[in-house]
Amino acid sequence: EFTSSTGDTVMIDEGALVEGTIDEDAVGAFGGEIVDTIVKQYGETRARVFINEVASLAMRAIMHFGFSIGIDDESISDAAEAQIDESMDNAYERVQELIDTYENDDLESLPGRTVDETLEMKIMQTLGKARDSAGDIADEHFDDDNPAVIMAESGARGSMLNLTQMAACVGQQAVRGERINRGYEGRTLSHFKPGDLSAEAHGFVEDSYRSGLTPREFFFHAMGGREGLVDTAVRTSKSGYLQRRLINALSELETQYDGTVRDTSDNIVQFEFGEDNTSPVKVSSSDDNEIDVDEIADRVLAAEFEDEGEEFAGEQATNLSESADDRMDRDRPSSHGAAPIDVPEVGDD
């Protein structure tokens, strides 16, 4: 029993799905609860079989029912668009109230912040809530069988934020965590007056990707997108270099039979592996789902010695030498009744 990414309870009893939906949290590459439990209780071999079976089942389901996504899957009703427009108007009014309070020197600064920083922070919070509100409105008008919603909620691809930006509102564009302030002297673009502090003058994109961005919104969006591209390139190079240094530094370390970690010169790096002599792979990540070692041992022993008809689910021990000898014995022709082989003598024509 565990909780899925959508907050629903997933319960599996004796291999049968009793409650909930299987999503990325159940069989995902990182932190899949079902796969993790199978590895700990039944071994890696059974987990590999399970992953292959799930992949085959998913492919058969997609081939049978079909799954596709198009531009119409991000469309919302006129009533939803009217609600979103009303939410945006309320956000603009709230931002203008903050600006008026700031210009009248009535805005109180937050602890540890200047008045200017307080204004920017409150405007960002207001516009963020407006985008979230637009996303909630759009989400209410999407059907449960919408392909985009299925992908987002199952964790297959994308998120509800991506769906919000496609259908409702892209939201505030940020550079270095702040509203866009760079551009011309005293203003971001020549389309705005100097000193304009409004939402649209500092990178707020009201439109959605489906409805299309205005030229000014597109320019601000490109500024935010450029930061993402540069950050991705820099982060990749830094993390790659860090990984290379770690590999070079740790490549000579190995765990000895006495539990210590040593290098090739037999210098002790750790008296116990990980300071607790415990493999993280075999440790439960949840206090609610502790590993019952006694139950696993009883089940394995029962399967091995009591019921010979039950297939052992764990990893079978193999002896490569014996396996090769058996294969050679099977392939070697029998000597009983075999026809004699003529071997020519040296010198015969």
From Swiss-Prot:
Which protein is depicted? DNA-directed RNA polymerase subunit Rpo1N
Q: What does this protein do?
A: DNA-dependent RNA polymerase (RNAP) catalyzes the transcription of DNA into RNA using the four ribonucleoside triphosphates as substrates. Forms the clamp head domain.
Enzyme class label:
transferase
Q: Name one cellular component (GO) term.
A: DNA-directed RNA polymerase complex
Subunit-structure text: Part of the RNA polymerase complex.
Give the reactions, separated by semicolons, that this protein catalyses: RNA(n) + a ribonucleoside 5'-triphosphate = RNA(n+1) + diphosphate
Family, similarity comment: Belongs to the RNA polymerase beta' chain family.
Bias class Basic and acidic residues marks the residues at 324-334
Q: Name one GO biological process term.
A: DNA-templated transcription
| Ranges for region Disordered | 306-349
Q: Matching Pfam families, A to Z?
A: RNA_pol_Rpb1_3 (PF04983), RNA_pol_Rpb1_4 (PF05000), RNA_pol_Rpb1_5 (PF04998)
Q: Which keywords does UniProt give here?
A: Cytoplasm, DNA-binding, DNA-directed RNA polymerase, Nucleotidyltransferase, Transcription, Transferase
